[in-house]
């Protein structure tokens, strides 16, 4: 285990432990990162957001997705409260499924500089067609176990 001393209060630059406003758009959201105490070890971290929402850019109707974000950290870890706020900022954002999914993956990769990152966006049907969107930064590092994302293909009543 790392010998990082426990701090009595979070850094004032982090949103963690602070009362913050919900960002009204993705561009206004801040993604926080914290130092990775295991930066010399390849391991997988996973975030799952089963109730992600955004808006259809044409109709303004809500779209829903189950997002799975896997990454092999480099020097930084993604702080989960800031991720929650960032994802919530899409609630009133109009964009197509593909754009939302890829933009989220690229933004996270830019902020934390992982060794590897992938995102799976499993969008619930609108107009009878589910859309699944996948993006990753490149080749997975060796010796990293990556479990299946665990989201079954959409089947409806069939």
From Swiss-Prot:
Family from the record: Belongs to the GTP cyclohydrolase I family. QueF type 1 subfamily.
Binding site for substrate: 78-80, 97-98
Domain of life of the organism encoding this protein: Bacteria
Subcellular location: Cytoplasm
Classification lineage: Bacteria, Pseudomonadati, Pseudomonadota, Alphaproteobacteria, Hyphomicrobiales
Protein name listed in UniProt: NADPH-dependent 7-cyano-7-deazaguanine reductase
InterPro entries: GTP-CH-I_C/QueF, NADPH_dep_7-cyano-7-deazaG_red, QueF, QueF_type1
GO MF terms, alphabetically ordered: preQ1 synthase activity
Active site: 56 (thioimide intermediate), 63 (proton donor)
Keywords associated with the record: Cytoplasm, NADP, Oxidoreductase, Queuosine biosynthesis
One biological process term in Gene Ontology: queuosine biosynthetic process
Pfam families in UniProt: QueF (PF14489)
E.C. number: 1.7.1.13
Function: Catalyzes the NADPH-dependent reduction of 7-cyano-7-deazaguanine (preQ0) to 7-aminomethyl-7-deazaguanine (preQ1).
Pathway named in the protein's UniProt entry: tRNA modification; tRNA-queuosine biosynthesis
A GO cellular component annotation in the UniProt record: cytoplasm
Stretches the record annotates as Disordered: 1-20
Coiled coil regions, renumbered to chain: none
Enzyme class at the top of the EC tree: oxidoreductase
């Amino acid at each position: 285990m790392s010998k990082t001393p426990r701090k009595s209060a979070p850094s004032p630059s982090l949103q963690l432990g602070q009362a913050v406003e919900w960002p009204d758009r993705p561009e206004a959201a801040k993604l926080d990162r914290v130092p990775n105490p295991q930066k010399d070890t390849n391991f997988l971290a996973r975030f799952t957001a089963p109730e992600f929402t955004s808006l259809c850019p044409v109709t303004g109707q809500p779209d829903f997705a189950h997002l799975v974000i896997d990454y092999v950290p480099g020097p930084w870890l993604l702080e989960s409260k800031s991720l929650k706020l960032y994802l919530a900022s899409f609630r009133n954002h109009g964009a197509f499924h593909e754009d939302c999914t890829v933009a989220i993956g690229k933004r996270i990769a830019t902020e934390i500089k992982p060794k590897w990152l992938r995102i799976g966006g499993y969008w619930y049907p609108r107009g009878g067609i589910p859309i699944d969107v996948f993006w990753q930064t490149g080749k997975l590092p060796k010796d990293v176990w990556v479990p299946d994302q665990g989201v079954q293909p959409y089947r409806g009543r069939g």
